[in-house]
């Protein structure tokens, strides 16, 4: 199936092309990319979750609250902006559907991250979101091998399996040329502080050792910035390959927004938090990193 161009826009001194398969291309005639607004936002919409994962950096649980999804700044999001929506369990939010419809109407591109165990519980809703094009990318967080999640990823090519460095070990079991994975850095934040142990540290070293052999086993392997650092990916692959997967430092064109606590930051691990404003641009300028 040919990929569709979802968005083409100018952001500061560069042009962004965003395709339906998740490919994002940034082009500039200058040596650096300086954003006028965030082209990607990590958006937390709930702290409710029934999984109680011991490494959860958001400390989500069954007492967690849902956020109000009518914050004024949401209406100021630019067409083509990507939202990586998560929680908690975002599928449990009672206003998820109308919120996604509002974002689609604004031209905002929504992606959703869910826990592997919620794929079965909310399967009909997930399929509805995909078929109605309310979301374009689906991230499924895995702790161990999950047959249903791998099958789903093979059937819906915009699905990415999310695994945490040091936690996930079953790379060979999920390896498939039709599967995309995202390796996330282990966050020593929230419950992740006390859960970290020598076994996790050992597994992080093992993952670093086997990483070069994994690239040919998957359709695509990508990393968040924390994983890039923890695994020292730059030393393991060619500079050309690294430049393909590296999209800039946190805060250059990205930011984190916690709608539950009504605050924003450079990333979800940032200790410097600021209260929400009514417009996305001054919010972004507050945390923006310019090189």
Which residues does each predicted region cover?
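Canonical Radical SAM [4Fe-4S] cluster-binding loop centered on the CxxxCxxC motif
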Residues: 31-69
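Residue-level recognition of short loop/turn positions
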Residues: 52, 87, 260-261
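Core AdoMet radical
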Residues: 40, 58-67, 79-93, 103-122, ...
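Short Asp/Glu-rich motifs
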Residues: 121-124, 193
């Amino acid at each position: 199936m040919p990929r569709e161009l979802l968005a083409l826009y100018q952001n500061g001194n560069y042009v962004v092309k965003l395709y339906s398969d998740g490919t994002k291309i940034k082009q500039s005639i200058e040596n650096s990319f300086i954003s006028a607004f965030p082209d990607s936002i990590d958006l937390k919409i709930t702290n409710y979750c029934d999984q109680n994962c011991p490494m959860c950096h958001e400390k989500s649980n069954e007492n967690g609250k849902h956020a109000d999804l009518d914050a004024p700044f949401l209406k100021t999001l630019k067409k083509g902006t990507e939202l990586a929506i998560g929680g908690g369990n975002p599928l449990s939010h009672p206003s998820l559907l109308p919120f996604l419809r509002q974002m689609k109407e604004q031209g905002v591109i929504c992606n959703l991250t869910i826990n592997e165990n919620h794929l079965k519980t909310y399967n009909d809703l997930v399929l509805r979101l995909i078929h109605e094009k309310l979301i374009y990318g689906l991230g499924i967080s895995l702790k161990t091998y999950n047959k249903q999640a791998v099958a789903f990823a093979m059937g819906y090519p915009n699905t990415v399996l999310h695994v945490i460095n040091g936690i996930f070990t079953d790379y060979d079991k999920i390896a498939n040329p039709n599967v995309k994975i995202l390796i996330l850095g282990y966050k020593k934040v929230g419950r992740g502080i006390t859960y970290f142990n020598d076994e996790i540290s050992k597994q992080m070293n093992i993952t670093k050792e086997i990483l070069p052999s994994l690239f040919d086993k998957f359709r695509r392997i990508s990393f968040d910035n924390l994983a890039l650092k923890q695994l020292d990916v730059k030393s393991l692959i060619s500079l050309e390959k690294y430049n393909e997967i590296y999209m800039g430092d946190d805060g250059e064109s990205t930011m984190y927004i916690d709608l539950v606590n009504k605050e924003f930051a450079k990333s979800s691990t940032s200790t410097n938090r600021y209260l929400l404003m009514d417009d996305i641009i001054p919010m972004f300028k507050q945390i923006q990193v310019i090189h």
